[in-house]
Amino acid sequence: ISRGITPKYNDESGKSVVINQKCIRDNKLNLELARRQDKEIPDLKLVQKGDVLINSTGAGTLGRVTQVHEDLPDTTVDTHVTIARPLQEISSAWFGAAISHIESYIETLGEGATNQLELKREVIGRIDLVCPAIDIQNQFQTIVEPMQQQILNLMKQNTHLLKLKETLLPRLMSGELDVSKLSSIE
């Protein structure tokens, strides 16, 4: 369990990606809202596939969780996000689902004044999870992992289609693109 870095932002040409609290919502990771930075990142603070990211400051965002389902090279989190990494002997798919299931409980664990709530690493570390036998965890992973990949692929396709729509629609509306000679799409 580790907190992120204090980044030195350089959104123009930063060599690494920094995930912030805005990126974590509805159990999804939106890298469109991430920023770039130049500072060296210790290996412990590099995000890995299977990590669970937990928003750790502020009322309204504290306790939101998501799991990383793909390799994200040169990616870290800022100090407002905690990385919870499953032990080697725990299935990452099961770990992510278990943490996600108790998100509303995690939201209640913040300490401090209303606008200064903080979720400490030690508090996250004291959360007890009931662990099924490893063969059950592995069966769970075998079933769930392809679904997680499909969700990730569909989210990427949706993002691509939205960008395509935003590019094409103004050109279609202005008449810059003429589709009258195209055969109908059925």
Residue positions per predicted region:
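Sequence-specific dsDNA recognition surfaces
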Residues: 1-9, 17, 21-52, 67
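Short secondary-structure boundary/capping segments
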Residues: 9-10, 73-74, 116
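A short beta-sheet element
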Residues: 20, 42-104, 110-112, 120
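Short acidic (Asp/Glu) and glycine-rich catalytic loops that position anionic groups and cofactors
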Residues: 28-29, 74-78, 142
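Short clusters of hydrophobic/aromatic residues that line enzyme substrate/ligand-binding pockets
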Residues: 29, 37, 65-68, 106, ...
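Short, contiguous acidic/charged loop-to-helix segments that flank catalytic cores in large enzymes
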Residues: 37-40, 71, 86, 131, ...
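Amphipathic alpha-helical coiled-coil/heptad-repeat segments
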Residues: 89-90, 97-108, 112-113, 122-186
